[in-house]
Each structure stands twice: as C-alpha cells, then as structure tokens.
Amino acid sequence: MAQFYSAKRRTTTRQIITVSVNDLDSFGQGVARHNGKTLFIPGLLPQENAEVTVTEDKKQYARAKVVRRLSDSPERETPRCPHFGVCGGCQQQHASVDLQQRSKSAALARLMKHDVSEVIADVPWGYRRRARLSLNYLPKTQQLQMGFRKAGSSDIVDVKQCPILAPQLEALLPKVRACLGSLQAMRHLGHVELVQATSGTLMILRHTAPLSSADREKLERFSHSEGLDLYLAPDSEILETVSGEMPWYDSNGLRLTFSPRDFIQVNAGVNQKMVARALEWLDVQPEDRVLDLFCGMGNFTLPLATQAASVVGVEGVPALVEKGQQNARLNGLQNVTFYHENLEEDVTKQPWAKNGFDKVLLDPARAGAAGVMQQIIKLEPIRIVYVSCNPATLARDSEALLKAGYTIARLAMLDMFPHTGHLESMVLFSRVK
C-alpha cells in the first residue's frame, strides 16, 4: 500500500510523551492518538503503553520512536530472527500471526469498503522459496558481507540465518558465504540468488568481472557437493548454466518449467491455495472461455485450462509468453493459447477476443490495471477475479467495475508474506443480472 509524504518536515522538540496503542497498521506500526493527531510508532502493538518521542510531525499525523515500553500486549511474541529490527526484510515478527492477519485484513476492508471473506494462508515460517542476497567486499577486514538491506538504508545486514527462508535455503547460508568468501573474485560479486524448486536448489551468482578458472572450478565443486544447479550471470542479460537442467516446480497438479530469472511466487503453499480458490470462485465450467490477463508464464492460465473449454493468456513480456506456450505443450494442454500484447491498448479488437469470454482473471503488477478495466467491461464476463499485490491500486481499479454494475462477491487477504508489511489480496466480482 503506497504512502506519500511531502518533503517538508516540522521541527520536533524530542519531548517524551506517554501513549496507548489502539491499533496496528498493515505495515506493522502501532497506531496511537496524541493531541488529536494520529501517531505511527514502529515496534508497538495494540494494548501497549509506552514512552515515545516524536521524530516527524506532519499536519495530519506524526511518527514516533519508542523510548521505553511500559506494558506488553498478550499478542507480543519474541522474534525468531536475531536480525529482526535491523534487517529490512521483516517488520512484524514481534506480533502474533493472528494479529498480523487481522490488521492486514482490516486495512484491506477499509480500502475496499467491504468485509474480508477469508484469509488464505499457509505456514508462517520457512515459506520463502526464493531469496536474493546482496554481496559486498570490505577492504579493511578483507571479508565478504552477504545479506539483506537494512531498514531504510542501502547498508547490508550480514545475515547468519533467516527463519522465513525455506529450510533448505537457510541451511545453505553459511556454506554459500564460506564458498563465495574464498573466491579470488570476491571483490567483484554483486549478489547471489537462491531458489528452491521442486526439481532441486538453484544458485545464481552475479559477478561483475570475469571469473578465473580456479574460481569456476571452486564453484563447480561446491555445486556438486551441495547438489545445486549453478548459474553464472556476468550481466543482466546473460545467464550461463554451469550445472543442472531446466528447473521446474509443481503447481496444482501441473509441472511448470521456468528460467532461474523468471518471476515465480515466493510462497509455494499460498500460491497453490490461491490458484485453487481462484478456480473455485470463477466456477469454471467445461464450456467456458476464460481470459487471463497479465498471465506471466501461466500460473493461473494452465490450471484454468484443465477445467475450461478454452483459455487465452495475455502477457506483455515475450519471454514469459514463450515459457507459457512451452509449459502448455509439456503438460499436454491443447486448449490454451498465449499472446504477447501491450495491455495498455484495446485487446478487445484482437481476433482471439471476437468470440468473447465468460470469465476473466487478472493478476497485474503493483501499478494495477487501470488501462484494461474498460476493456474487461466491454467483454461483459459473468465473473472476474482480480489478484492484487497493491491494495491501493486494487481499490482504484475496482471503482470502474462497480460503476459498470459488478459487485464484490468475495474478498480474500492473501498472507503471502508473513511477518512483513506486504499485503496481497484477491477479489471476486460478479455481474448484476
């Protein structure tokens, strides 16, 4: 959810004030009131009292930091990660999972002006199947930093563990650090990505200078000893396969191959449940024609094709369209077609849209789908499922559908990223008869 602030800040006196927190926003900040103004205070939970100092004073709200906590909420928990509070990855490990879900659901309900029907969640720990770790060589100590960015900073937190990572990936952290820290090229490493696929574990190393034969041999030995598929990335365009074959993951009974750099949902458990619920909400029938917009490489498109008469997937990235077509062939799905289109243009005029669609699904990026809402309305589908990673743009885009006679039939909060401030959601719109 985007927040916008003006650059001008008011001078604060650093006076210590005592506040009582009555709410938690979707970013994990405690919310209190003082002198008629809303205060946002990181680290505090509802039912907690604390002494705080104001750090930023605006006309309608202020920000504060904790000086001393005077009481603890019954929903306060001890963070599992020793880096919590410094690392910018997680913001809510101090809150119970139930409180996190309630606060995010409440924020979503306020934006959408509709009750949240359900929370789609899975395991709250060990859920991330993909991580990108920054690398930085420290000349003074001749050591390699490996970790995530600090909150509000470009500095790196040198992580030793990360409990939200898939266990296989977390166990690799010290081994990867030791291997990379022994390379001659450790001054010229950008980042390393770790991915846990169904087919196995991937390591993608971004390096900014050519690797010596000794370094390449060391990396190959490491990949073989740990059973990793190894990829080298000398720049943003080139990806060299050193070991391993095309990776794949299981999704709703299908096997989907992907390139190591392709986007895949990081939370496999929630993704499976999300796809299953989307198909259920659309109530896909054997005679249905279904349109999937912003389809990527077919996360929803291919499962839809197992139930519908025909499915069209439309995507703006050519490489993902090609991957979707490849996965359709691999899974023996002949009733699905993928098209590369500019979704800012009127896709209803394309030949594949002339017979219309009964159901539509869309899963846009954070910018939302303002450019296609009128096109969807022209198609007059009976049901629409909108999957969103930004509730602000979801609320904006929903207005067009509501004005066109659609109603919100179901609203779900997707707990895709427990312990963080990320809020994802899914809505079912039905056309009023």
UniProtKB/Swiss-Prot annotation:
Binding of [4Fe-4S] cluster occurs at: C81, C87, C90, C162
> What are the start and end residues of every segment in region (Interaction with RNA)?
23-40, 58-63
Q: What is known of its domains?
A: Contains three structural domains: an N-terminal TRAM domain, a central domain containing an iron-sulfur cluster, and a C-terminal domain that displays the typical SAM-dependent methyltransferase fold.
Gene name for this UniProt entry: rlmD
Give the protein's biological function: Catalyzes the formation of 5-methyl-uridine at position 1939 (m5U1939) in 23S rRNA.
EC code(s) of this entry: 2.1.1.190
In this chain, the site described as Interaction with RNA is at R132, R149
Binding sites annotated in the UniProt record for S-adenosyl-L-methionine: Q265, F294, N299, E315, N342, D363
Q: Where is the TRAM domain?
A: 10-68
Per the record, what are the reactions this protein catalyses?
Answer: uridine(1939) in 23S rRNA + S-adenosyl-L-methionine = 5-methyluridine(1939) in 23S rRNA + S-adenosyl-L-homocysteine + H(+)
Q: Which family does it belong to?
A: Belongs to the class I-like SAM-binding methyltransferase superfamily. RNA M5U methyltransferase family. RlmD subfamily.
**Protein name according to UniProt:** 23S rRNA (uracil(1939)-C(5))-methyltransferase RlmD
- GO biological process assignments: rRNA base methylation
Q: Name the InterPro entries for this protein.
A: 23S_rRNA_MeTrfase_RlmD, MeTrfase_TrmA_AS, MeTrfase_TrmA_CS, NA-bd_OB-fold, SAM-dependent_MTases_sf, TRAM_dom, U5_MeTrfase_fam
Q: What is the lineage of its organism?
A: Bacteria, Pseudomonadati, Pseudomonadota, Gammaproteobacteria, Enterobacterales
